[in-house]
Amino acid sequence: MAHTTQLTMVGTGSAFSKKFYNNSALVQFTNGYNLLIDCGHSVPKGLHDLGIPLESIDGILITHTHADHIGGLEEVALYNKFVLGGRKIDLLVPETLVEPLWENSLKGGLRYPDEDSPEPELSDYFTVRSLKTSDYGVAHTQIEENMAVRLYPTVHVSHMDSYAVGLVDRGEDKVFYSSDTIFDEYLIDYALTYPWVFHDCQFFTGGVHASLDELLNYIPEEDQARVFLMHYGDNLEDFFNKTGRMRFALQGRTYIL
C-alpha cells in the first residue's frame, strides 16, 4: 500500500501526436489499487516502455470513445484472456457509454474469440462497473471504501458523451482530470476546487480542446501553479516558458498528489 496518491503520465500527446503516446494517466491509490485513465491505441506500448506490466493494472476508466482513448482496450482484453488465462480487470465506464463502447467500438474486434464459444459480450472480457452520470453538474460513484470517482460532463464533440474525472482517495479530493473538453469556464471552476488539475490543451484557439490562450486568460495566476497541461501537440517546445505559472505534464513523470 502506498502512503500517498500518485499519478503517472503514461502518455501526454494529442490524438495525432507522433512524439508522445496517447494521453493517459495511471493513478495509484493509497489502498494499492492501480487505475488507468483511458487506454488509447498507443497506451499499451507506453506502459511497456515505463516497465509497467498489464498484470499490475486493476482497472481502466474510460472518459469517452475516441480511439486515442479506447483504442488499446482490444489488446488489453485479448492479452488478459489468452495470455493471462482469462483474467478480468475492472472497466469503469460512464453509464451512458457502456452500450456504445461495445456496440460501436469494441465488438468488431472482440466478437468472435474462437469458433466454439458463444458470442461474447463486454462483460466476458472485463468486470464492467457502470459509473453514475449527470447531464448537469457532478455525479459521484463510490468504487471501494476509500476510493471514489466523480464525473463531470464535458463538451468535446457533438453526438458523443464525454466526461472529466475527479478522484477521491480516503475521503480527500486529490485531482481533477479533464480528459478532452473545449474551453469551459464552469468546468474550470469545478476543477479549481481540487488541489491539482490536469487539463487538456491545444496550441491554437478554436477546435475541440481548450487552448493555451484561453486557459491563461481565465485561470487566476495564483491558481496556475496547480495546473498541469496535457494532450498537447508535437510542437510542445515552441511553447516552453509561455504557459504562465502552469506547467506541462511530462510523459513518464510521476506526480505525488
Curated annotation (Swiss-Prot):
Pfam families documented for this protein: Anti-Pycsar_Apyc1
Binding site for Zn(2+) 1: 68-69, 180, 231
InterPro entries: Anti-Pycsar_Apyc1, Metallo-B-lactamas, RibonucZ/Hydroxyglut_hydro
Region annotation (Beta-lactamase-like) ranges: 21-231
Annotated residues for binding of Zn(2+) 2: 64, 66, 156
Keyword Metal-binding annotated: yes
Annotated keywords: Host-virus interaction, Hydrolase, Inhibition of host innate immune response by virus, Metal-binding, Viral immunoevasion, Zinc
Cofactor binding, per record: Coordinates 2 Zn(2+) ions. One protomer coordinates the metal ions and the opposing protomer provides the catalytic residues required for cCMP hydrolysis.
Cofactor(s) required, per the database record: Zn(2+)
Top-rank taxon, per record: Viruses
Any one biological process term the GO annotation gives: symbiont-mediated suppression of host innate immune response
Catalytic activity, reaction form: 3',5'-cyclic CMP + H2O = CMP + H(+); 3',5'-cyclic UMP + H2O = UMP + H(+)
Gene3D superfamilies recorded: Ribonuclease Z/Hydroxyacylglutathione hydrolase-like
Disulfide bond positions: none
GO molecular function: 3'-tRNA processing endoribonuclease activity; metal ion binding
Function, as annotated: Counteracts the host Pycsar antiviral defense system. Phosphodiesterase that enables metal-dependent hydrolysis of host cyclic nucleotide Pycsar defense signals such as cCMP and cUMP.
UniProt record similarity statement: Belongs to the anti-Pycsar protein Apyc1 family.
Subunit comment: Homodimer.
Name by which UniProt lists this protein: Anti-Pycsar protein Apyc1
Organism of derivation: Bacillus phage SBSphiJ
